[in-house]
Amino acid sequence: MNKLIDEITKSQLNPDVPNFRPGDTVRVHAKVVEGTRERIQLFEGVVIKRRGAGISETFTVRKISNSVGVERTFPVHTPRIAKLEVIRRGKVRRAKLYYLRNLRGKAARIKEIR
């Protein structure tokens, strides 16, 4: 039974997911359906967490919009993501960056890997 589940989930994995980690700044091109129309919505921010494995793996992106923090969680292998771009590589020493929720302005910046 497990082999069958593994084969099915392996066929559903998205092969062109870039290598990204918490602390990286990414731009997610998400497909949004409004009525009968489908359009692409950009969401750019810092990856604050990545959890799970395989088909159920998700990541959360945080951005500041109109001085309000907005977090959005995406499944890594969903067909609703048209494209995922890594803008900057961040240097962090944690896997979960929840502490960024309490920081404002320059304190919330993440050092870039050269």
UniProtKB/Swiss-Prot annotation:
The keyword Ribonucleoprotein applies. Coiled coil: none annotated. Keywords: Ribonucleoprotein, Ribosomal protein. It comes from the Bacteria. GO terms for molecular function: structural constituent of ribosome. InterPro entries: Ribosomal_bL19, Ribosomal_bL19_CS, Ribosomal_bL19_sf, Translation_prot_SH3-like_sf. Pfam families: Ribosomal_L19. GO terms for biological process: translation. GO terms for cellular component: cytosolic large ribosomal subunit. PROSITE patterns: RIBOSOMAL_L19. Gene3D superfamilies: 2.30.30.790. This protein is located at the 30S-50S ribosomal subunit interface and may play a role in the structure and function of the aminoacyl-tRNA binding site. HAMAP family: Ribosomal_bL19. Belongs to the bacterial ribosomal protein bL19 family. This is Large ribosomal subunit protein bL19.
